[in-house]
């Protein structure tokens, strides 16, 4: 009987520990970024074309954080905390980010001991090719290389 209790307790422990892990994993996945599909996109005060335009974005692939959904509209927030609604036809799944650290170094390989390729200014838009634990391979303008993941704001996962 004691052996069955130990097995039962182990199964319960396993269930709760894995559910905790998956809850954390799902919470991470809920941070959802999209990017702007066009070089001119309206940010509206509400989820319809009748609502006034708050802001006009003029940067294709600018990363946008999705806060909420309403049919064909997404409530969004940008890196400057401007929030409003964008129609889904104006959003893309293209992985992009903004560099948030001034003079961050772009490296040839994902290590600080690699050859530096360029320095990126704050606000520089980058397209994400792939990410590892602490690094992302990006392209920006004519440059392609690796940058530290924690310097980026956008869809890095």
Q: Which ranges hold each PLM region?
A:
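Bacterial N-terminal signal peptides that target proteins for export
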Residues: 1-11
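Compositionally biased, low-complexity segments
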Residues: 13-15, 44
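C-terminal segment of classical bacterial N-terminal signal peptides
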Residues: 15-24
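SH3-family beta-barrel domains
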Residues: 25-45, 55-60, 67-109, 115-134, ...
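Second-shell loop/turn segments in exported
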Residues: 48-51
